[in-house]
Amino acid sequence: PPAQTLALTAATPAAAAAAPAAPGQTAAAAPAAPKLTITGSFASDCAEERIPRLILSPEQHAAGAFDALWREAGGTIDGHVLAASAPAAAEIFHSADSQPLHMVLRRINKSSDNLMARLVFLALGAEHAGAPGSKVKARAALDVWLAERGFSFPELMVDNGSGLSRDTRIAAASLGELLAWAYHQPWMPELMASMAIMGVDGTLTKRMQSEPIAGRAHMKSGTVRDASCIAGYVLDQDGRRWVVVALVNARPGQRLAAWHGHAVHHALLRWLMDGAKLP
């Protein structure tokens, strides 16, 4: 049935007036809390599903999270949080390390978490050229890494590090070359374990469940409007490991439904499992 329009206001405190400015500084009023409006329809038998979305700016998200956690711990805050450069004399009073990279990548690749993927990309830039991380720094770090290992992918364009950019480009042959190289690296087991398993878990849970390939393909999938892709490793019934990359895009001026791309993927994978026989 049609869903009534819902309007949700983020629980981030907003100031009605600006905080006093120090001499020589300009203070701005905190922005009003953003509103998320949801419209559309859904089937009456839809199961519960969680869809993570970040509707706040990074500054609002950080300020709101700090405010909530601080008050939860019994603290109080007077005034408002403003987005500005940290004073030169500021000192870090606490820092926290993330989970190990292989655990982070497992969360990203199994469920196709684009937000986390982008954060890892930005962290790459910060490690390469110092904080704060940026897309420009991250791209430079990636270029250096590829060049040091002898890779040359002229067509490569990584926009924001996630799967939600229509500017990102790579050829299937280039991605296959990279995956073949990665298979012989000492960290290969961690990389493969981070990928969804066909018919078993992650984004591939419901695909090819009752077919021989179920449980034998570790792959990263990606689907947006007019594009459907898979890339990873397949173990055939003769014990051979294959690198498989299939990037399916709509022709100019045409549309591509996700299931159209899936049909191509599944046909290719069945062919491999049948022995990869040429006509």
Describe each model-derived feature in a short phrase.
Residues 121-279:
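Small-residue-rich helix-loop
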Residues 1-189:
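A small/polar active-site loop signature that marks catalytic segments
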